[in-house]
């Protein structure tokens, strides 16, 4: 199962193990700091394939992170969102998952 781990850049989760399904075969990330970095570390330390979608600023300009997020959620089988309750980017992912009926688990974590 391809699991996208997305979230606010100011959040960190040290033990992702309890949030990630055991049938996970691939972690999908946006390559940013915060939750994305936690996801990359988790994948590396657990020998799980990591796929990173980076924003294409040359192609999309300021909209690049939002375009990247759409690619992530379309690619993944499950999206796990860690949200600080404020991040507009994470909220956008949550809203898009709901609109597209993409399987989504939301964890609201304050900084």
Predicted regions span which residues?
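Acidic/glycine-enriched connector segments
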Residues: 2, 7-26, 30-111
């Amino acid at each position: 199962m391809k699991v996208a781990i997305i979230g606010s850049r100011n959040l960190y989760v040290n033990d992702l193990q309890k949030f990630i399904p055991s049938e996970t075969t691939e972690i999908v990330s946006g390559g940013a700091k915060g939750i994305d970095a936690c996801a990359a570390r988790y994948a590396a330390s657990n020998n799980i394939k990591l796929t990173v979608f980076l924003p294409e600023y040359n192609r999309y300009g300021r909209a690049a992170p939002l375009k990247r997020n759409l690619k992530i959620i379309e690619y993944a089988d499950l999206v796990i969102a860690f949200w600080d309750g404020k991040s507009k980017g994470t909220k956008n992912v949550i809203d898009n998952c709901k609109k597209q009926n993409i399987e989504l688990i939301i964890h609201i974590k304050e900084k």
